[in-house]
Amino acid sequence: MSLNQQEMFEKLLEQIEMPTGPEFTEAAIDKLTVHQASKVWEFHLHFQHVLPYTQFMTFQNKLQIAFKEIARVTFTIVTDDTEVNGRELAEYWEWIVQHSGIKSPLVQSLCNSNVPTYEDGRVILLAENEVIQNFLTNQALGPIESTYHRLGFPKFSVHTMIDESASQAKIKEFHEQKAKSDQALAQKAEAAIKKANEKRQKQADAPAPIDGPVQLGKQINPQEPAKQMVQITEEERSVVVEGYVFDMEVRTLRSQRQLLILKVTDYSSSMVVKKFSRNADDEAQFAALKPGMWVRVRGSVQEDSFMRDLTINAYDINETSHASRQDTAPADEKRVELHLHSNMSQMDATNSVSDYVKQAAKWGHPAIAITDHSGAQAFPEAFAAGEKNNIKILYGVEANMVDDGVPIAYNDAHVDLKESTYVIFDTETTGLSAIYDRVIELSAVKMVKGNVVDQFEEFIDPGFHLSETTTNLTSITDDMVRGSKSEEEVFKLFREFYGDAIVVGHNVTFDIGFMNTGYARHHMGPITNPIIDTLTLARWLYPNLRGYRLNTLAKKFNVNLEHHHRAIYDAETTGHLNHLFLKDAEDRYQVQFHDQLNDHMNENAAYRHARPFHATLYAQTQAGLKNLFRIISLSNVEYYYRVPRVPRSVLNKYRDGILVGSACSSGEVFTAMMQKGKEEARQKAGYYDFLEVQPKPAYSALIESGLIADTDHLEEIISNMVELGHEMNIPVAATGDVHYLNPEDKIYRKILIHSQPGNPLNRTERPDVHFRSTDEMLKDFDFLGTETAHEVVVDTPRALADQFEIVRPVKDKLYTPRMKGAEAEIEKLTMDRAHAWYGNPLPEIVQKRVDKELKSIIGNGFSVIYLIAQRLVFKSNKDGYLVGSRGSVGSSIVATLSGITEVNPMPPHYRCPNCQYSHFYTNNEYGSGYDLPPKDCPECGTDMVRDGQNIPFETFLGFYGNKVPDIDLNFSGDYQPIAHNYTKVLFGEKNVYRAGTIGTVADKTGYGYVKAYERDTNQTLRSAEVDRLAKGTTGVKRTTGQHPAGIIVVPDYMDIYDFTPVQYPADDQSAAWQTTHFDFHSIHDNILKIDILGHDDPTMIRMLQDLSGVQPESIPPVDPHVMKIFSSPEVLGVTEDQIFSKTGTLGIPEFGTRFVRGMLEETHPSTFNELLQISGLSHGTDVWLGNAEELIKDGTVTLAEVIGCRDNIMTDLIHYGMESDMSFQIMEHVRKGRGIPDEWQQAMKDANVPDWYIESCLKIKYMFPRAHAAAYILMALRVAYFKVYFPLIYYTAYFSVRADDFDLVAMAHGKDAVKASMKAITDKGMDASAKEKNLLTVLELANEMLERGFKFSMVDLDKSDASDWLIDGDTLIAPFRAVPGLGLNVAKQIVAARADKPFLSKEDLSKRGKVSKSLIDFMTENGVLSDLPDENQLSLF
């Protein structure tokens, strides 16, 4: 089976012996190019984030060493990072300078003498003077920027600034010594070259990678004792430590020596270990070291002034073996873990499911189960890990089960509630177990018609000392019970007291449990009287109360409770509440008799009030998996209350194919056995397919909290569970309730739980719940005897695992939706418009293109995808909102003709709208049809349409047309929710879902958890230990979310549970959409995802249309006046000096940024094709800087001729005469930064492709699709049209749609005030905040508007809109949201209150408009409220 890109990368890590880590999550090899002639292998890698420098150096070194004998290795990294990390920028600096190709030793020296800083979004490099600044700018910055980008850093520019602190004397001295310095530098350069040659020779002579274990320095005597790191508290001359390497870095210093930095832990603490290389042998040893190794280190402990921590300066470092846990059981007697939590158990477990599967396979276990809390989000990873490690995966979940309704009454009897006598009783006990604890006070009141007629109150001597906890909770002391009556005597007296009355209690099942267990102990029968539980009675009658504790209810219903947790007071209070509740039940529900109460036990969302208990549910079959998905979905969507809940009736309904286990100490069987004994447990156990018992340490919290007295009682309970299983013929399996892999990982879970202050798990010490081997598990159950222990640990789990079919949680192919007649409809839409545009019969060039595309689209089942997009676009256009396309959909003429995109991919051509005459240009005469000169039809004289962007279909669906189309559509942000909801109309509400995401603990969050734990536990941890602990908490599920645009479409012949469970994002039950439970990346190859994006451009176009009445489609794509703004602002009636810009493109999409405006200034585009080039160049990587920019500057080619978009490569090469398939392959390689194989380069040369073209291709790392650029440019030109011809309407739309930050006072005061405000921001330089930088962009447009002769007005209480700017003559009236500190909600409130009636005063505005005093003051100071008095005034007439 072929490997995917991620699996290929994992294989690479294995080959170079690089341990995996979170830095390599989802890492992939995008492409590997092998140059056979030059023996160069080019790796193109994709990581989520820029690698930490230590990891990068390790990875690079291991890669070089691994392939040293095969080829020279180069690599390029692409990451998902969008922001520069200043720390990483600085850490990489020396390496970047050394490897950026800077040839001048002087320039290298200047770079090495400084390190850039990253402040407020800018990378700054200080220079002592202008000379150095020019050296850096002209010779260093471009290569440095490109090299950073090659390592995955986001695209950025380095800005040089003069260091004002440099003295004038130093500057003068520099000029005087320039000649001398140049000579010295030349000599230094010569020496450097010589040294570099020597180094290369030295490296060539360097020893091969080491074969044996790492040994740096001398051998350390294995018998020499190692000191625990936690015991190292001060500097020491010599110390030996032994530990696990969890992080490392190798730095190459300016001296060319290497510095090894290890982070090592022995799990008592962690320390940083440093060592400098002495020779090439040391460097080879450095390269052989890797995270995951165990090492012994001897060195001195010193305070590191830079790290401000104790570090070990190593003399010797020896790789050492470490005895990891083994499973020594025979192969056919290995256990199977049936209860295990991965890091997808929200904030409760630490290891990935892959970690567990790998360990289980290493131990030889035949299978392993996954049972995360309430979810299945680890299933896709578990499936992949199972296949990789050849181990059977049992897919399960630990569910929060609830009874659908808890009985209100017990021992139903047809007795009149009004006329009955009630005995309301309460007990005080020594604990919660009716088996192991005792009643120490029994009190009751007898009531008739709400009046107390008798009392019963007795202490009971339990025969043992009361614990401090019991006394604190009940206020009962030893003295109070000592010498009291016995339990048997008091229980007999109480039976006489209650007689035939109705027995009542609050949470009465607890008290009845103690009473009936006591009666059984004394050979008396249980209570058979009718019973009422006021707790469930209150929950039924009053389902929306926040709490149902006795004291809470007493306060709510004004019933006096003198001393809560004393039995007599609790009993009397319960009696009065019972009287009130039964009267209410009669009035509201006509309940008259005791046996009517339980008719209502399932009402008012009773599942919300039932106490959840745990059960483990496993999918034994594929049908069972679907049922499990359904159950998980229902628990998250319909029965969510604080946690996802599974009503017993839901499990009963969908139990087919599901195995049910009794779970952990929170399961109902174990709880019953612990609290009420074997007979109660027997009643519960019959529901389960197997019973679970767990190692004694897993129950430690029960002993600590007093629920179980001691270990002896715990062993008795576990033994009783096993006996019960034997008696009922129910299998009993020993399970681990695993939450982490190894014992030392316990601390990570502890930190996670500590980060949740309200988590009840914080009340006790966390138990030992690591993944246990067969040996460890047998030892934990040895108290059962050898035979029984083997049965529950080995035999039963293996037998259960054998009952499972091989289940697949992820499909193996794509399932697209069906729409009846989609193929015929797409074909008809295409052909109808084709004939309307080009006539019938079609021109051969059109017919061939249409036939080719329809064959691919229909033949591969893609018609429905096209039709979905067509329906969405059609509806949006019909509703008045244009849709912009993203990606390569504009490469398809079928998409164009069916109305999905406005981009026409045919070669440039004329077509007559009247007689359908057409003429195509197929020899690259024009880059874009929009650039054709106006021309009348030679047949009928009609002005012809000019169209065609010359884009090959292959860029969309691949060379063979079988690639699944990815149609991304840009809808107006205002219209996006409507477009999303329209998919429900198209497919039905049960067939569309938002694409789900999973939010996990990130590095910084984990660091914060550790620091909080350190603070709250009064510890002082070394920085290395903080790093280790933070690493252990990362990747754990925190929450869930949804993709902002992705809609998942389920085909009508399947349902969502065939693919994934569903839920609400972040468990928000008020959310409008349900999401996939699986992260959408897990199922993206199995089910269709449509990206319906929200974008400002369509919103702005709609507003421009509404204000002007001009239909956007009627705007010519290329207007001569509009095109002038790309070269000069003069067409706007302003000069460069007035608006501080050499172009008129401020505020124009795609062309308004400083970077792109700089490109415009250099290239002066005048055609649509050249604008396409600019768009492609600005979005690509290594396409403009150091590439096309230089080709244009030195006159090699023009803007129109450089490679701008990916599609140009294929069409250009075909034009040169190359075969279309090779042209396509070269385009694909180049656009992804994979280079060009030598044989293809030769083919290009044979076709007379210029050298500059080939060299340009080789530099490119990423290229923009031409169709995407064309759609963006078309939208931008429409916006620009309004800026030129309808200026005030344009500015209204811009400030309403695109601007969020305003300086309203400056704008209202005119251009001088605006310019002053702009200067105040620019003067701050790097110190300007992000908000100020955003404001500067808005002020640039405000200044331009003012310079064009228009004005701004302060908000107008009577006219202003809440959010949009309004036109009033030549003035724009500000909306209320433009007032500093006035949010949109308040703005809407002001407008709503104004519509109701005019404001009478400032007081009235404050009250009805919800306007704060500070906002009132602002408006008053700026003349907005000049006509309003301060307060309302009464009129006498």
From Swiss-Prot:
SUPFAM superfamilies: Nucleic acid-binding proteins, Ribonuclease H-like. Keywords: Cytoplasm, DNA replication, DNA-directed DNA polymerase, Exonuclease, Hydrolase, Nuclease, Nucleotidyltransferase, Transferase. One of its GO terms (molecular function) is DNA-directed DNA polymerase activity. It catalyses: DNA(n) + a 2'-deoxyribonucleoside 5'-triphosphate = DNA(n+1) + diphosphate. Its main location: cytoplasm. It is an enzyme of class 2 (transferase). Residues 422-578 form the Exonuclease domain. Residues 196-219 are annotated as: Disordered. GO terms for cellular component: cytoplasm. One of its GO terms (biological process) is DNA-templated DNA replication. Required for replicative DNA synthesis. This DNA polymerase also exhibits 3' to 5' exonuclease activity. Belongs to the DNA polymerase type-C family. PolC subfamily. This is DNA polymerase III PolC-type. The lineage of its organism: Bacteria, Bacillati, Bacillota, Bacilli, Lactobacillales.
